[in-house]
């Protein structure tokens, strides 16, 4: 079914560099010690929890998505993009709850004729693509770092997403010949978000950091896969998933 895999290098890819969550010797830190290490490092790097969380997300996905051929690289980036996009929406909801306001307050809500609900708005676009530490900024920066000389047209993806609301084409990535993921972004989001949210909450903490956790995960995966999948293609796959999944109502997927 799939045509491109990490293959024999999967074992190496599944071993992120040493971090406070993975001490020398390869064993896991006791949970209390891990959280204490994160709390201490936050004094120097406020993003440390999100960075460690990103590594943990990639490690878990590599384990979950591996079969006898390895890990299908396009599927990994589609999944990470879907999670990163929805994390932007979930982050805004989480921040609203902390402030004691309606979780829908940050959004412009669009209801379509097919009975579905979608979420838009400047705060959502900011977390996804417009802020200095947006998902797009971090992922595109990694792509350039690993040699990408061109980037996808993010505005075109936004426009195509909006025009597909209420149709069967919503959330269907534009095909890149030879680089199809194994499932649609919504399928990855539906199955993976509930499984990964607890560890993201634990390691990243503040809802503001949830999208960054997945953006750092994209960076981590891009570094691992740069010799298997061109960084600009990895970035395109991720953003083709992230933008529409930032708009969806998770409970209806």
Residue ranges of each PLM-predicted region?
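Solvent-exposed interaction surfaces and binding hotspots enriched for charged
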Residues: 2-253
């Amino acid at each position: 079914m799939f045509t491109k895999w990490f293959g024999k290098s999967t074992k190496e890819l599944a071993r992120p560099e040493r971090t406070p969550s993975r001490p020398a010797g390869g064993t896991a830190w006791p949970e209390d010690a891990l959280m204490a290490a994160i709390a201490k490092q936050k004094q120097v790097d406020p993003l440390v929890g999100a960075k460690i969380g990103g590594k943990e997300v990639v490690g878990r996905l590599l384990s979950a998505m591996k079969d006898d051929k390895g890990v299908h690289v396009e599927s990994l980036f589609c999944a990470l993009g879907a999670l990163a996009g929805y994390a932007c929406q979930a982050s805004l909801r989480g921040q609203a709850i902390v402030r004691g306001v309606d979780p829908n307050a940050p959004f412009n809500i669009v209801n379509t004729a097919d009975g579905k609900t979608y979420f838009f708005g400047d705060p959502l676009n900011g977390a996804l693509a417009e802020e200095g530490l947006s998902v797009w900024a971090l992922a595109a920066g990694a792509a350039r770092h690993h040699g990408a000389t061109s980037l996808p047209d993010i505005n075109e993806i936004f426009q195509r997403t909006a025009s597909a609301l209420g149709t069967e084409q919503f959330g269907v990535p534009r095909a890149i010949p030879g680089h199809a993921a194994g499932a649609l972004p919504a399928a990855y989001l539906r199955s993976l978000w509930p499984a990964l949210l607890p560890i993201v909450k634990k390691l990243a903490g503040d809802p503001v950091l949830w999208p960054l956790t997945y953006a750092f995960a994209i960076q981590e995966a891009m570094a691992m896969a740069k010799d298997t999948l061109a960084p600009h293609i990895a970035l395109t796959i991720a953003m083709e998933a992230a933008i529409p999944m930032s708009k969806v109502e998770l409970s209806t997927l």
